[in-house]
A protein has these predicted regions:
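Anion-binding and metal-coordination hotspots
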Residues: 1-183
Length: 183
């Protein structure tokens, strides 16, 4: 049994759509079963609340053994959570990275390798004239499409598990993990 983080970006399209969909969210600690829409949440009133939804998924996985690799279907529970507080935290961190990227562009520093959390991931370099001819100098700028693409995942956090624990127990464990990551 395990609980492991699940990047939403790496899920199949229909699962990403389900994870990011606006409706069918439950409120942690609310026993009524009332469903919420994320678009109807209040940034102040619902700031400290923790919303979630869950479903079973089947994923094909490659199991590596001494006798070679083999494919196996793994059935596991996908739990996605959403928190306005976590969304705001992620936006705050990104804003600092964007400000560093702006300074890099302004300094004329060369844009080398871009890592996952490197501010340089927001920088795009263009080395052509308006006519499409190769230019002698490259122009770097902040690519807002990268920012927009990341922003759609703000506030969401997903885990997969095979634990037999209750949803509430798994969500509490997940919440503690996320709080540790914010430190």
């Amino acid at each position: 049994s395990y609980i492991t983080t699940q990047p939403i970006k790496t899920l199949k399209g229909f699962l990403q759509d389900w994870c990011l969909s606006d409706d069918e969210w439950l409120l942690d600690g609310d026993k009524s079963g009332k469903k919420y829409k994320l678009s109807e949440l209040d940034s102040e009133h619902d700031r400290d609340k923790y919303f979630y939804k869950t479903r079973w998924i089947k994923e094909e996985s490659i199991i590596r053994t001494d006798k070679g690799d083999r494919k196996k279907i793994i059935e596991q529970k996908l739990i996605v959570s959403y928190s306005i507080k976590y969304r705001d935290y992620q936006r705050h961190v990104r804003q600092g990275q964007i400000e560093r990227a702006i300074k890099i562009v302004a300094s004329g520093e060369p844009i080398n390798k871009k890592k996952v959390n490197d501010p340089k991931r927001f920088i795009k370099t263009y080395q052509a004239t308006n006519d499409g001819e190769l230019a002698s100098q490259a122009v770097s700028y902040i690519d807002t499409s990268v920012i927009d693409a990341e922003e759609k995942y703000d506030g969401f956090y997903a885990v997969c598990t095979k634990l037999d624990d209750s949803k509430e127990s798994i969500i509490r464990k997940n919440k503690r993990r996320r709080e540790i990551e914010e430190c």
